[in-house]
Amino acid sequence: MGETPRVIDGPADVHPTAIVHPKAELGAGVRVGPYAVVGKGVRLGDGTEVGPHAVLEGRLEVGPGCRIFAGAVIGYPPQDLKWKDGTPSGVRIGARTVIREYVTIHRSSLEDGWTVIGDECFLMATSHVAHDCRVGNGVILTSYTGLTGFVQVGDRAFISGLTGIHQFVRIGTLAFVSGCSRLPQDVPPYFLVEGNPAEVRGVNIVGLRRAGVPAAARLEIQRAYKLLYRSGHTPAQGLERVRTELGPSPYIDQLVEFIAASRRGIV
């Protein structure tokens, strides 16, 4: 093509077998491995590494310090029958996120829409993030996990392998989803779910401790769990008891707001 990609504020290391479009933008210290493809309009933040045979296409913005491993495919059109070729949409990925081998991330199905992944996430090999998903900061997706369209995942949630998640489902902050689960409904923050279909089994105590949630707040969350799931109430009755008997606290407030906003119901 005779042109070289635009490099912002410093040199990039591009393997001679890689194909980088002249209208891609590479930050300082970016490394692009053998046979990788970086398409038109892709923007890579400082220090990001792209492994061999990875394919990055379309309106794709990758933050600084990310690592994209071999065979990952990011920014391709959504697997949506309503999709029309040429619809302007994209993918945004935050800083210091790790994307392992053969992960697939599709761009939004909506005009000027975005599929969004936050900072410091870890997407393990072969996991999939579909169009229009919103993934928070510090989220871990383990291998063979699939997020379908419009799924939302809260900060520091952990989703174990071979989990299938229905379109439009929301997974709350610091939730833990056990392996081989099926999620047809929303998962409230802080809880541990497992099964096909998934059921709440308890509180994600290990995750709460690792996140530095104070002991008093963990006890409040455990009380909320018992009111919601172990007191024989309907979800609405349990939620009302949580509202009136617990808090106010940032953790209980977030739990109540999440459940109250659910359109699909909660597991």
Regions found by a protein language model. Give the residues of each.
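Terminal amphipathic alpha-helical/low-complexity segments used for targeting or macromolecular assembly
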Residues: M1-T17, P22-K23, A28-G29, G65, ...
